[in-house]
Amino acid sequence: MYEIIQKLHSGWAYLAFLVLVIAVVNSFVGLFSKKDFTERDRKIALFALAGIHTQLLIGFVVYFVSPLGFSALGQMKDAALRLTSLEHPLMNIIGIVLITIGWMKHKKLTTSESKFKTFSIYYGLGLALILSKIPWGSWFD
């Protein structure tokens, strides 16, 4: 059971990462080209939000089922266990919170520039935090 959930978490990560990168690039392009914020731009950001939240939910299941997750919290001297039991989940949760804040803030804004700027900042920071603690070794096994 654990292996299936772990593979789902790893596989979905590629899709969630791709959509999030598209959303960040789209927001920077919109900001710097001074284009109007359209329904297409909103949907790109929404799909990134939904994809990354789905990844979070799958990650919670993995965290509590995995021998490398919650049960390994007492072994902070081991860098690999610390990454999977503390650093990866914590930084990803913070990154996803920033992405969620960006989504919530954009709804109150009225100008295209402010919406693109908000997505660029919050989604961009969220992406940076997520990228900082991905266990890259397991991505390319």
Language model features with spans:
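Membrane-embedded alpha-helical bundles that constitute the cytochrome b-like, heme-associated redox core
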Residues: 1-141
